[in-house]
Curated annotation (Swiss-Prot):
Widely expressed. It comes from Mus musculus (Mouse). Residues 317-330 have a biased composition (Basic and acidic residues). The modification Phosphoserine is found at S306, S318, S325. Pfam families: RPA43_OB, SHS2_Rpb7-N. This is DNA-directed RNA polymerase I subunit RPA43. Keywords: DNA-directed RNA polymerase, Nucleus, Phosphoprotein, Transcription. Component of RNA polymerase I (Pol I), a DNA-dependent RNA polymerase which synthesizes ribosomal RNA precursors using the four ribonucleoside triphosphates as substrates. Through its association with RRN3/TIF-IA may be involved in recruitment of Pol I to rDNA promoters. InterPro entries: RNA_pol_Rpb7-like_N_sf (IPR036898), RNAP_I_Rpa43_N (IPR041901), RPA43_OB (IPR041178), Rpb7-like (IPR045113), Rpb7-like_N (IPR005576). Component of the RNA polymerase I (Pol I) complex consisting of 13 subunits: a ten-subunit catalytic core composed of POLR1A/RPA1, POLR1B/RPA2, POLR1C/RPAC1, POLR1D/RPAC2, POLR1H/RPA12, POLR2E/RPABC1, POLR2F/RPABC2, POLR2H/RPABC3, POLR2K/RPABC4 and POLR2L/RPABC5; a mobile stalk subunit POLR1F/RPA43 protruding from the core and additional subunits homologous to general transcription factors POLR1E/RPA49 and POLR1G/RPA34. Interacts with RRN3/TIF-IA. Interacts with RRN3/TIF-IA. The lineage of its organism: Eukaryota, Metazoa, Chordata, Craniata, Vertebrata.
């Protein structure tokens, strides 16, 4: 019973334990097929190389009857990880060929050693080269890109660039971005990571695109604003004309109303009404004469002109006439 229980526990552990080759594949990244990878080789800034390579593989004894499956599991586990023998990172392979008819067993080791050949597509960038990536993250400190759909690249904000300038680049998720390779890193598991920096061409393109957008918006605003200003001027002219007309109408009304009121007698007696009419006529005649024959009025020392001297002269003439008339009678 104890032996049976131990064997059952071992079988459960073996079933729960993941396969070595499957554990090596990164599930979060999309691996391209060999045909898709070969199509990317000819693209600009790909840094991909397609070439055949020979590899040494230690095959487990359990794969003696299915050698191709064992070889594929080992090669799949090495994808997207830096390989010193390949001097790069393999992303796809095809056309596996076993070199030699027999394998080798060394000493008391249970693995069978084989040499194989396969066509690999290798990603081998170097510092200073230019890459093309798809933006998948934009933050205030860096930009994240995905190269060939499977390699992460981080582009930090330059130290000499201000936060406002960094925001004016207008880089959005999904945009294609060119950058220069600054450094290549890999962690303890061999996961490949790229450190990059913005290239001068990408900065110039972004700045030119931003300047063109700004120029277009300014032109559109000017075109939209100019007819509005003309309308405002027309409205102002119409308003001024309306105000002038209203002012003239008000002036006419004010000129008419006092005349009508002055012509109406204020007294209740009829005699007063008839007495006031000749006085008004005399006043009108005097005004008419003064308008035709201007008289220079006397002025005081202060410069104020008055009719008081004229009245005095008239009184003197009347008194002299009255004084001479009784003498003549005598």
């Amino acid at each position: 019973m104890a032996a049976g229980s131990v064997e059952s526990q071992r079988s459960q552990a073996a079933s729960e334990r993941p396969v070595a080759g499957q554990a090596g594949v990164l599930p979060c990244l999309e691996l391209p097929s060999y045909a898709a990878a070969c199509a990317l080789v000819g693209s600009r800034y790909s840094c991909l190389v397609a070439a055949p390579h020979r590899r040494h593989i230690a095959l487990s004894p359990r794969y003696l009857s299915r050698k191709r499956t064992g070889i594929r599991e080992q090669l799949d586990a090495e994808l997207l990880r830096y390989s010193e023998s390949l001097l790069g990172v393999p992303i796809a392979y095809d056309n596996i060929r076993v070199v030699g008819e027999l394998g080798d067993i060394y000493d008391d080791q249970g693995h069978i050693h084989l040499n194989i050949e396969a066509d690999f597509v290798i990603f081998c960038p170097e510092p200073g080269q230019t890459l093309m990536g798809t933006v998948n993250k934009v933050s205030s400190s860096h930009i994240g890109c995905l190269v060939h759909g499977c390699f992460n690249a981080s582009i930090p904000k330059p130290e000499q660039m201000s936060y406002e300038e960094w925001q004016t680049l207008e880089i959005h998720v999904g945009d294609e971005l060119e950058f220069d390779v600054f450094r290549l890193d890999s962690d303890s598991a061999g996961v490949f990571c790229i450190r990059g920096k913005l290239s001068t061409t990408s900065l110039q393109l972004k700045h030119s695109a931003v300047s063109e957008d700004v120029a277009e918006t300014v032109v559109e605003e000017v075109v939209e604003k100019t007819p509005k200003k003309k309308k405002k001027k027309k409205d102002k002219d119409t308003d001024t004309c309306g105000t002038v007309d209203s002012v003239t109408e008000v002036a006419d009304v004010t000129d008419v109303t006092p005349q009508e009121e002055t012509d109406i007698p204020c007294s209740d007696n009829v005699n007063d009404f008839f007495e006031e009419e000749p006085k008004k006529k005399k006043k009108k005649k005097k005004r008419h004469q003064e308008d035709q024959d201007p008289i220079f009025q006397a002025s005081d020392s202060s410069g104020y002109q008055s009719d008081h001297n004229k009245k005095k002269k008239k009184r003197k003439h009347s008194e002299e006439a009255n004084f001479e008339s009784p003498k003549k009678r005598q």
